[in-house]
């Protein structure tokens, strides 16, 4: 569960390394984001020469959470870290590579480009 002020690692090569959540998109009183949800965040750490700079406000999709997600068959998927991928307005990733595994729930949210770029889909 990602909420306001949550810090996430960035799982792509857009140049950002860490994000701070500003808002969870989807409804007026929505408090938490899970895997496959879109957030508005600011870049807290960035690598030099990247596409995004420190202080930029970006949209991102959550790809890994420590709290995990429940599957329809009753099983749970959990990760060791909270991570997100920075996206454009058309839901395509800003970077050209995805690092680390991503959850299968992204396929249900129509993030097919992220799923195809990921080295492993769990």
Curated annotation (Swiss-Prot):
Keywords: Ribonucleoprotein, Ribosomal protein, RNA-binding, rRNA-binding. Pfam families: Ribosomal_L14. GO terms for biological process: translation. Disulfide bonds: none annotated. GO terms for molecular function: large ribosomal subunit rRNA binding; structural constituent of ribosome. It comes from the Bacteria. One of its GO terms (cellular component) is cytosolic large ribosomal subunit. Part of the 50S ribosomal subunit. Forms a cluster with proteins L3 and L19. In the 70S ribosome, L14 and L19 interact and together make contacts with the 16S rRNA in bridges B5 and B8. Binds to 23S rRNA. Forms part of two intersubunit bridges in the 70S ribosome. Belongs to the universal ribosomal protein uL14 family. This is Large ribosomal subunit protein uL14.
